[in-house]
């Protein structure tokens, strides 16, 4: 959903406005930042602007973003549900890494089933016009923002956990009480940092052409608070992108050196070789996820920086919306990549989910098994090599 984030002069008129409508990436986890969207020439009456939503390139971009949203709803909705269901049923899956992944899965699942339908209506059906009221506008924007930060912070926590487990194996591992506190910290930090995205979110009616109005939903910062807006964006850019990416890169670089370039002392038994293979597989998947995160979100942050700090670059740019949609689709695809990697590659959770369905089907078909028998069987299923791999210390 296009969120109108920006700065607005409260005393400005419709003919000469200092208002920068912002495309807040509600549809792509971008809904979290104050990003200025210059819809037209700032000194030009808005009702003389061309309606870019009627162009062919915009139509093609609309189709692409619609397909991306459908993909998110299907892949993230179904895939993350499978992961969460398997984790809830099988205790052997509940190691620290999987618990951290579960938080990422929960946040993406909520976005897929709650936010994406509204984004589909905003981006594709109504072509950048919000018709669901201020409360939902702020709520969807806030949930999108929190989800993005939870994903980033969870990936950072996973990288640090892998670093401690592999590079410093003699140190005591984190207890479940500490892990619970870490998970709570991931959510609390994300919830607090995202508060401005809800506080400054509002609806604004804009006249795009003489006879057409569109209701933009997004963050609007008063013009006298522009310095705070830019400071907030740089703060977010630092603690939710640059900082985590640098930290994760250093962690995985050190882990790679430990696993691939350092000789293992002593006699290598089959169990030791198996553990090494498992750890390498896990780290490779996590490194691919980090690479995908950077490739998906770096263009979006770069686009936002140019838009917010060098707005004249986009003045009178006819294909601005199309460019935004391309960047938006790339960013949105990151959640699907995470889901595919964590669910189908790293954890073999589909196999466990099939066992859940099979056991429930047998119980209902036979009508003789009690829920206690069912729980006894499901909690006693031995862990697979993939699960053991993740839990190796």
Curated annotation (Swiss-Prot):
Keyword Cell cycle assigned to the entry: answer is no
Q: Kindly list every residue the record annotates as glycosylated.
A: 11, 14, 36
List the Pfam families hit by this protein, alphabetically.
Answer: 7tm_1
| Native source organism of the sequence | Bos taurus (Bovine)
The family annotation for this protein states:
Belongs to the G-protein coupled receptor 1 family.
Supply the name of the protein: Prokineticin receptor 1
Q: Which Gene Ontology MF annotations are present? A: G protein-coupled receptor activity; neuropeptide Y receptor activity
Question: What role is this protein assigned?
Answer: Receptor for prokineticin 1. Exclusively coupled to the G(q) subclass of heteromeric G proteins. Activation leads to mobilization of calcium, stimulation of phosphoinositide turnover and activation of p44/p42 mitogen-activated protein kinase. May play a role during early pregnancy.
> GO cellular component terms?
plasma membrane
């Amino acid at each position: 959903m296009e969120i109108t984030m920006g700065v607005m002069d409260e005393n400005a008129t419709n003919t000469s406005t200092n208002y920068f409508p912002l495309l807040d990436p509600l549809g792509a986890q971008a809904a979290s930042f104050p990003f200025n969207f210059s819809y037209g020439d700032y000194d030009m009456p808005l009702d003389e602007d061309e309606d870019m939503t009627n162009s062919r390139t915009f139509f093609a971009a609309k189709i692409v973003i619609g397909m991306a949203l459908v993909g998110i709803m299907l892949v993230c909705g179904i895939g993350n549900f499978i992961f969460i269901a398997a984790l809830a049923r099988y205790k052997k899956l509940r190691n620290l890494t999987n618990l951290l992944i579960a938080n990422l899965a929960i946040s993406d699942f909520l976005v897929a089933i709650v936010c994406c339908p509204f984004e589909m209506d905003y981006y594709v059906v109504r072509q950048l016009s919000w018709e669901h009221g201020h409360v939902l506008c702020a709520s969807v924007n806030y949930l999108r923002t929190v989800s993005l930060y939870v994903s980033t912070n969870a990936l950072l926590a996973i990288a640090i956990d892998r670093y401690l487990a592999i590079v410093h194996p003699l140190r005591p591992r984190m207890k479940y009480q500490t892990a619970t506190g870490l998970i709570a910290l991931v959510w609390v930090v994300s919830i607090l940092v995202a508060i401005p995205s809800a506080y400054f979110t509002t609806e604004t009616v804009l006249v795009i052409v003489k006879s057409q109005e569109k209701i933009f939903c997004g963050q609007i910062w008063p013009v006298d608070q522009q310095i705070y807006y830019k400071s907030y964006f740089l703060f977010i850019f630092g603690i939710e992108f640059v900082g985590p990416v640098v930290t994760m890169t250093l962690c995985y670089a050190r882990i790679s050196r430990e696993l691939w370039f350092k000789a293992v002392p002593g006699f290598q038994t089959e169990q030791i070789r198996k553990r090494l293979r498992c750890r390498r597989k896990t780290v490779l998947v996590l490194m691919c996820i980090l690479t995908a995160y950077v490739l998906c979100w770096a263009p979006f942050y770069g686009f936002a920086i140019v838009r917010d700090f060098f707005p004249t670059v986009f003045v009178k740019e006819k294909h601005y919306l199309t460019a935004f949609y391309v960047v938006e689709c790339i960013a949105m695809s990151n959640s699907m990549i995470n889901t595919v990697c964590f669910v189908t590659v790293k954890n073999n959770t589909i196999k466990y989910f099939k066992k859940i369905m099979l056991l429930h089907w047998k119980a209902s078909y036979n009508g003789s098994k009690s829920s206690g028998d069912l729980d006894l069987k499901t909690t006693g299923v031995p862990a697979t090599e993939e699960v053991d791999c993740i839990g190796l210390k």
